[in-house]
């Protein structure tokens, strides 16, 4: 928040490229009401589960606070057994005998290993979709290049068929994927342009907030946010200490971050053998002094652990790691890692105050030589 305030503080928003950009995805005028149809809820508020705490929540019993125990789960576009924090608890939850799990997938992921049913999903080559971006302002159209292979179906078709079997007869459950692509932007994007060219640029100015007009109640860049203060959060962008701060624990003196490995995209592509061969094995980048204190040599198998769990990887002594900080590279699928583990054994289900997201990089650990190399 403090960094985001700097361009307004010095008046840089008036200049082309003078502002700040986290992601361009918020600039897309998606008609979410047309796609999500909140009007059909008729005043009801369905229970929502934060996917970052799925490990705890799958293990929770029924209670007035939590509601009924989770008895069924449909997983799509995700591999939570590999990517969700504190994966030891995630595995315990998915392994419950009384949990009915359906996974929509292309591959036999760690999560698919715990499915009662695996339904084959179409790939991007086989279905309609529209795409936003993190870093540019073109809407992109995805048209199927081939018919669905075998029994594969788009997620949306599975949802339509499930809705029909559950007795939902609203017209929206009969919308085709192409119709939803057309409805996604309404009259904000020329769909004929999309069909012709495959992409359509948004009509956005080079200096969007040169004259103000921020999406805030005041229309200004608000250094103090009354909306956040009303939620019990700090209205000013003050420093918030880490959940697990370096130096706060004698037992776990190292801070661990878990950035993507060079040849994977988080947990995607880990199943591609040629990419695994290039990546080698799960690596932990560690500073030479931290390694020497623990008798760790370059290339030896180490155990990284805290109170939440442990995982195994190979030590990579590197100047990229500063003293006191280690880098657990990549979200390896558990079954493709060392000893059936990955870095998310150690990450926490604690949530941030703003946004209720996971604190993946607030993670204190210890590193030791593994007993068996």
What annotation goes with each model-predicted range?
Residues 149-200, 267, 272-285, 289-373:
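Long, contiguous, secondary-structure-rich segments that constitute the structural scaffold
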